[in-house]
Each structure stands twice: as structure tokens, then as C-alpha cells.
């Protein structure tokens, strides 16, 4: 019975972790969109004050590859955690059915 309780606790923690990682994924997507927007605005030849102010915000290196790599890693981590969750859920159900019968 103690093993069953541990499995239930771990599955609940995995669900919370998946939620946090999905929040991180949304933040990464938002950051990537913001950098793309700033990069597109700065690419427009315009001498207005708006573009001059945005040039101050432009980072030295807009490396989108790093952001795409991190985004792919977070998505892979979510998939791995979902597989672990399903395995633990199956184990919990199997243990519970074994205890009942």
C-alpha cells in the first residue's frame, strides 16, 4: 500500500511539473515572437524615433537557433514526463486492482 501511495504522489508531482514546463514553453514562444518582431521592425529602413529607440533594445546577437533548441528540448521533456506519468498511472491502477482482489 505504501508503494501505491508513493506512485500516486509521484504522478501528482509529475503533473505539476508538466504544467510548469508548459508555462516555460509559452514564455519561450512569447520571447521568440518579441525578438522576431523587434528584428523585423529594425530591418525596415526608417529614421523615425521609434526605430531609433528600438535599436537601443536590440541585443548584440539575436540567436534564434538557441531559442528554437531550448523550445524543442522543453517539448521533448514534456513528452518524456507524460510517458513516465502514464507508466506510473498504469502501475498505480495495477497495484490498486491487485490490492482489491
UniProtKB/Swiss-Prot annotation:
GO cellular component: host cell membrane; membrane
Positions of transmembrane segments: 76-96
Domain of life (superkingdom): Viruses
Membrane disposition: Single-pass membrane protein
Pfam families linked: Corona_7 (PF02398)
Coiled-coil positions: none
InterPro entries: Corona_7 (IPR003449)
Record's keyword annotation contains Membrane: yes
Compartments, record wording: Host membrane
Endpoints of the signal sequence: 1-23
Alphabetically ordered keywords of this record: Host membrane, Membrane, Signal, Transmembrane, Transmembrane helix
Main location: host cell
Family of the protein in this entry: Belongs to the coronaviruses ns7/ns7a protein family.
Function noted in UniProt: May function in the formation of membrane-bound replication complexes or in the assembly of the virus.
Name of the protein described by the UniProt record: Non-structural 7a protein
Organism from which the protein derives: Feline enteric coronavirus (strain 79-1683) (FeCoV)
Lineage, highest ranks first: Viruses, Riboviria, Orthornavirae, Pisuviricota, Pisoniviricetes
Amino acid at each position: 500500500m505504501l508503494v501505491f501511495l508513493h506512485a500516486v504522489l509521484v504522478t501528482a508531482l509529475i503533473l505539476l511539473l508538466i504544467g510548469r514546463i508548459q508555462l516555460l514553453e509559452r514564455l519561450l514562444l512569447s520571447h521568440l515572437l518579441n525578438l522576431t518582431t523587434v528584428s523585423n521592425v529594425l530591418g525596415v529602413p526608417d529614421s523615425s524615433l521609434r526605430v531609433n529607440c528600438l535599436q537601443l533594445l536590440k541585443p548584440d546577437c539575436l540567436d534564434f537557433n538557441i531559442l528554437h533548441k531550448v523550445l524543442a528540448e522543453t517539448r521533448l521533456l514534456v513528452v518524456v514526463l507524460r510517458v513516465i506519468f502514464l507508466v506510473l498511472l498504469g502501475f498505480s491502477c495495477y497495484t490498486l486492482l491487485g490490492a482489491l482482489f
